[in-house]
Every structure is written in structure tokens, then in C-alpha cells.
Amino acid sequence: MNPESVFPRATGSADASVRPAFPDDAAEIARIQVVTWRTAYGDALPAAVLDEWDTDAATASWRTAIIAPPTPGHGVVVALERNDVVGFAAFGPAELTAAEQPDPAGPTAELVALLVEPRWGRRGHGSRLLAAVSDLVRSGGAARLQVWLLESDRVSAGFYESAGWAPDGWARTLDTGGEPLREIRWHALLDDPDAAPQEGTQ
């Protein structure tokens, strides 16, 4: 997959753009991740998850994901406001559940993370990230894109719904060492014109 071949569609304006992540972005990605978790999900995530956050380990993990992705279908992209990294998205091939059959329409990709630092929200960065990931996985042969959302996360659900996504009927419960977290899976068909992100929704 050649990321540069699909990025012109999703670059946005001169002040706001999306590009492939570079190794030097890893520390900023880790910082945005924990800031966003604490701000947006502090009430949902167990305190231990945030209290035990290891910035150095997270930075190293993101650097590895950028430099040596586990498959050609994995990738990380970042959203820029001028030259500042303000958000990121990570994606890869989806793993089927034990009771699930492959989609006859073609392979499914999974959006592992899409986070925009809260102070940069409502400027279209989330929409541009989603458009870039959709283009990248579509160019890699995926017919469908999915994401797992916390059942209580109505803000993210509203964002994906406005982009033409919908729950696909699957749910799972995560054991985080505290209260169980229930997640709902959302999806979009990549050839569906209604699944195009709307500019400025996040």
C-alpha cells in the first residue's frame, strides 16, 4: 500500500491536513492519547488504567507501530493544524470473532483508534482522519471498515452516525480490572456514498 497515492484527497486546507505518521510523532501521539482518555473517558475508564499510564512505554509502542507495522495493512496517520500534530488514527486488518464468518463483500479493516485532542475539536480533524483511513484501507482492498466504541460514548457514536456508520449487531465486554466495559461495534461499507465523513463534525 502506498499512502502517498491516496493522501491528496484527504489533505484538507493549507492550515489543516492529514499525513502518514513519522517516528518522531510517537511521543506526541502518546501524549494526545492519554490527554484525550483523561478528558473524554475519565469517567468510563478505571482509574488504574490512567494512573498506571507509562508515557515512555506508550511512545515506544507507537514508534514501533509506525516504523515496523505488523502487516502492510496496518498504519498510523496524524492530523495537523499547520505544523502541530493535533490528532491521530491507527488502523489494521480486522480480526473476526469466534462466531463470525468472513464478509462476502471482501476484507474488513478496523479503526483501532481515532482521537483528536479536545482543545482542537470541532475543526474537522476527525472527519479528515476518517476520510484518510477510509481511502487507505479501500486502496488496500478492504470493502468494510469497523470500529469498537464504548456503549456509553454517545459523542463518538454521534460522530460516526453523522458519517453514515451504524452498529452492526456485535458487542463485547472488556475486563479492565474494574467495572466491565461494554463496547458496541459500528461499521461502514467503503463503497457506500452515504458513509463519507461530513466536514467539520469533529
Where does each model-flagged region fall?
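Acidic/polar helix N-cap motif
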Residues: 22-25, 153
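C-terminal "cap" of GNAT-fold acetyltransferases
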Residues: 105-109, 146, 150-202
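Charged catalytic carboxylate motif
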Residues: 28, 128-129, 155
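Extreme N-terminal starter segment of soluble prokaryotic enzymes
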Residues: 15-17
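Conserved GNAT acetyl-CoA-binding A-motif
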Residues: 137-149
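Hydrophobic pocket/interface hotspot
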Residues: 29, 33
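Short phosphate-binding/catalytic loops that engage adenosine nucleotides
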Residues: 125, 142, 165
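Acetyl-CoA-dependent GNAT
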Residues: 3-11, 20-23, 34-44, 50-121, ...
